[in-house]
Amino acid sequence: MLTFALTIVRHGETQYNRDKLLQGQGIDTPLSDTGHQQAAAAGRYLKDLHFTNVFVSNLQRAIQTAEIILGNNLHSSATEMILDPLLRERGFGVAEGRPKEHLKNMANAAGQSCRDYTPPGGETLEQVKTRFKMFLKSLFQRMLEEHGSALSSAPSEADQPVIAGLADDGAQNVPVHALMVSHGAFIRISVRHLVEDLQCCLPAGLKMNQVFSPCPNTGISRFIFTIHREESVLRATRIQGVFINRKDHLEEVKNSD
């Protein structure tokens, strides 16, 4: 059995984000000046946390964000950054490079909601969820192999993480801590899978519209996993959400504009 924290961060802003254009997987854009500032602010916010593992989408905007976060970290600058294509953004097919309004118009013409619509050549929601499930499987395996001897106690059903609005909320007594840097649509689909399919426990008072809202650039979420092996299968026996889409660190970016 192993208990570990997973902190999820969306990449910083790109010019395509600013211009409300879809990037998906086919358009590999760098961070904008604001995106660099956002990533640095996230790095300063998380600077005192020790990330034992780091997993990053292999798209440029995510890699740059992770590099900046780790560059600001006091304990994790030497942690290996694993680039994983499973963490890429949802593929939007023919809609990539087009305005988001174009995707909405395509969905309306097809008689579907924008969230459920798959443009030609794009990934379905189920395909993206399958990628996240594959990532979780490899994550559980790696964490148990590397940290299976770490001392950790499983939180009880009655345990609720202390949420004080601090960067280490929920992770104070969890020595194994992974950082994942990915993308907006991918994170949104992943969180929905954790909550709806895997029965992730949520903090008291958190409303569902907050849980499933779009993640802002460098928005931060945290989950505590307890995993163990049943025969030859690794599974999570408990998942506790600590916070979702936190953006406190972005205040300093706004104030500097």
Swiss-Prot record:
The record marks 183 as: Transition state stabilizer. Its main location: cytoplasm. Its EC number is 3.1.3.46. PROSITE patterns: PG_MUTASE. The active site is at residues 11, 89. InterPro entries: His_Pase_superF_clade-1 (IPR013078), His_PPase_superfam (IPR029033), PG/BPGM_mutase_AS (IPR001345), Phosphoglycerate_Mutase (IPR051695). Coiled coil: none annotated. It is an enzyme of class 3 (hydrolase). It is found in: Cytoplasm; Nucleus; Mitochondrion. SUPFAM superfamilies: Phosphoglycerate mutase-like. It catalyses: beta-D-fructose 2,6-bisphosphate + H2O = beta-D-fructose 6-phosphate + phosphate. The keyword Hydrolase applies. Pfam families: His_Phos_1 (PF00300). GO terms for cellular component: cytoplasm; cytosol; mitochondrial outer membrane; mitochondrion; nucleus. GO terms for biological process: apoptotic process; autophagy; negative regulation of glycolytic process; regulation of pentose-phosphate shunt. Keywords: Apoptosis, Autophagy, Cytoplasm, Hydrolase, Mitochondrion, Nucleus. Belongs to the phosphoglycerate mutase family. Fructose-bisphosphatase hydrolyzing fructose-2,6-bisphosphate as well as fructose-1,6-bisphosphate. Acts as a negative regulator of glycolysis by lowering intracellular levels of fructose-2,6-bisphosphate in a p53/TP53-dependent manner, resulting in the pentose phosphate pathway (PPP) activation and NADPH production. Contributes to the generation of reduced glutathione to cause a decrease in intracellular reactive oxygen species (ROS) content, correlating with its ability to protect cells from oxidative or metabolic stress-induced cell death. May play a role in mitophagy inhibition. This is Fructose-2,6-bisphosphatase TIGAR B. It comes from Danio rerio. The gene is tigarb.
